[in-house]
């Protein structure tokens, strides 16, 4: 086979630079169990100084920033599943995206483990924002919060957003965050917090609550 030097500037197929980053972290008791809580972070990558097309984002720095999520209250890191996806389109604004998905196995999902998981993700997401570029904090409207809630639940649990209805909502103005509850036509509930990291709307947590079963109002005979 003949080796050929590759000129990146003339390549027809290229992934280009990374324009956006999505990180998704989920926790479950074991690989055979369902994920009970997911955390999503969506970030835009700032243009490099000088406006060049080079990719200045180091993916290894993002993975290093995510390491705190592996502990979830334990002294040693827990087992995990990691996948990474990169895509790019050649038309329009030619966006390039990097997606990182991480599932962590914690054993029994106790309250202490859940709280430690939350703290680890919040710390890791702050570090990822420093690596990628800290976004400007802007007020999140109710409409934007509802749309992000629907998209987050659909992304995290592969549910049809048209099958979800809003059951409850609460606005935390001081924190620039929203807490909303969705219910599917199948009876599943999703508790969503938009802006759980420093009020940034692109940081969303989704908890899959137990299915609501219809109760017999008469009771057993």
What would you call each of these model-derived segments?
Residues 70-84, 161-169, 201-207, 211:
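Short secondary-structure junctions
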Residues 73-137:
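Membrane-inserting effector segments that mediate pore formation, membrane fusion
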Residues 1-88, 150, 154-158:
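Membrane-active, amphipathic/fusogenic segments and juxtamembrane/transmembrane anchors
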Residues 120-178, 189:
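Amphipathic, membrane-active segments
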Residues 56-73, 105, 109, 206-218:
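Ampiphathic alpha-helical segments that act as solvent-exposed interaction surfaces
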Residues 15-27, 89, 100-106, 112, ...:
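Hydrophobic transmembrane signal anchors and adjacent membrane-proximal interface regions, especially
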Residues 31-35, 92, 169-176:
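Short, ordered beta-strand-loop transition motifs
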Residues 167-221:
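C-terminal assembly and membrane-engagement modules of membrane-active proteins
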């Amino acid at each position: 086979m003949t080796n050929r030097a590759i000129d990146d500037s003339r390549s027809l197929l290229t992934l280009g630079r990374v324009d956006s980053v999505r990180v998704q972290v989920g926790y479950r008791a074991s690989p055979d169990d369902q994920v009970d809580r997911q955390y999503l972070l969506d970030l835009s990558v700032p243009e490099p100084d000088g406006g060049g097309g080079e990719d200045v984002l180091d993916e290894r720095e993002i993975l290093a920033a995510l390491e705190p999520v592996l502990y979830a209250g334990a002294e040693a890191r827990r087992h995990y599943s990691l996948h990474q996806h990169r895509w790019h389109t050649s038309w329009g604004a030619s966006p390039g995206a990097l997606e990182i998905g991480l599932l962590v196995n914690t054993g029994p999902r106790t309250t202490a483990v859940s709280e430690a998981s939350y703290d680890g993700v919040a710390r890791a997401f702050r570090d990822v924002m420093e690596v990628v570029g800290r976004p400007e904090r802007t007020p999140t409207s109710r409409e934007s919060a509802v749309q992000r809630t629907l998209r987050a639940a659909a992304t995290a649990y592969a549910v049809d957003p048209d099958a979800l209805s809003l059951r409850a909502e609460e606005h935390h103005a001081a924190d620039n965050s929203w807490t909303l509850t969705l219910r599917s036509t199948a009876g599943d509930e999703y508790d969503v917090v938009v802006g759980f990291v420093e009020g940034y709307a692109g940081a969303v947590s989704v908890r899959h609550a137990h299915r609501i079963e219809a109760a017999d109002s008469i009771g057993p005979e």
